[in-house]
Amino acid sequence: MFYQSSSSLTQILHSFCGNTEMETPYPKLIDPSKTRIGWIGIGIMGSAMVSHIIAAGYSVTVYARDLRKTKDLQTKGARIANSPKELAEMSDVVFTIVGNFNDVRSLLLGDDGVLSGLTPGGVTVDMTSSKPGLAREIHAEARRRNCWAVDAPVSGGDAGAREGTLGIFAGGDSEIVEWLSPVMKNIGTVTYMGEAGSGQSCKIGNQIAGASNLVGLAEGIVFAEKAGLDTVKWLEAVKDGAAGSAVMRLFGEMIVKRDYRATGFAEYMVKDLGMAAEAAMPGAALSKQLFTGMVANGDGKLGIQGVVSVIRRLNGIS
């Protein structure tokens, strides 16, 4: 992510505001004591991410269909909205990180959605892994309403969310992404990828590479098992060679220990890889089949490292 000095950023804002061709005034400088944050999506990752923002001093309002999920955040100071529209009316910037693109469409573009309540000059930031085309549609509708929209899906799993070290892939207007940096720095590192939809395209590419890497790791471990090797020693032997990777560091020991706690749901990986189908990606298609096998076995809510269970079944290992 690129950062400007405060004086440099102020100059950018003043020059941007002075552009009479812009229908929407550039948003006011972010100030934790004044900028109101709205948040939709308080699952494993979302609750950790918004907790960092609350800890940084921002006033935060959350919306959840199940109010029981909001109790912990309420103890930290979060307020509750009764609908996405009401949340938007109470916010300057609204973040969403939900299950799938249908939820995104409803929450942002629906009759009672975020954009129906956001004040002109407001900003939406969708951090869900979603479709590039939907991100462009949301951006166009936001601009029609004199608001702004950024697509900013993340990578790093629940560990990255807890530690505030997520990778964030941003698409949209570069000045808006820059403007958001005082908030975004609390949850991770932003890389600006380009126009609306570019963040989502980056995330799909990330998932293709990550899933294929994870499947390869799982197959390597199962092969080592079938060969009678000590899989802990196998991991130690190969981790610093060409086969070593962040995926191996994150998931290798968990796979060996059959620890399938969710760091990212397998069913979401199926969704993400499905969005790669518009291009000829045979490796991604094979990976999708294996993760789909997890879901078919009733393991869709397990962590993505559980894909090894499908490979073990194929090899007759219980």
Curated annotation (Swiss-Prot):
Claim: Oxidoreductase is one of the keywords in the record: yes
Q: In which pathway does it act?
A: Amino-acid degradation; L-valine degradation
For this chain, one GO molecular function annotation is: NAD binding
Q: Where does NAD(+) bind?
A: 35-64, 129, 271
Top EC class of this enzyme: oxidoreductase
Q: Which Pfam families match?
A: NAD_binding_11, NAD_binding_2
**Which residues participate directly in catalysis?**
203
As for subcellular location, the record says: Mitochondrion
Q: Keywords in UniProt for this one?
A: Branched-chain amino acid catabolism, Mitochondrion, NAD, Oxidoreductase
**Catalysed reactions, as listed in the record:** 3-hydroxy-2-methylpropanoate + NAD(+) = 2-methyl-3-oxopropanoate + NADH + H(+)
User: Which InterPro entries is this protein grouped with?
Assistant: 6-PGluconate_DH-like_C_sf, 6PGD_dom2, 6PGDH_NADP-bd, HIBADH-like_NADP-bd, HIBADH-related, NAD(P)-bd_dom_sf
Instruction: Please provide the Gene Ontology terms (biological process) for this protein.
Output: valine catabolic process
Q: Which Gene3D superfamilies is this protein grouped with? A: N-(1-d-carboxylethyl)-l-norvaline Dehydrogenase, domain 2, NAD(P)-binding Rossmann-like Domain
Q: Which GO terms describe its cellular component?
A: mitochondrion
**Assigned EC number:** 1.1.1.31
Please give the family membership noted in the entry.
Belongs to the HIBADH-related family. 3-hydroxyisobutyrate dehydrogenase subfamily.
The protein depicted here goes by the name Probable 3-hydroxyisobutyrate dehydrogenase-like 3, mitochondrial
| Annotated source species | Arabidopsis thaliana
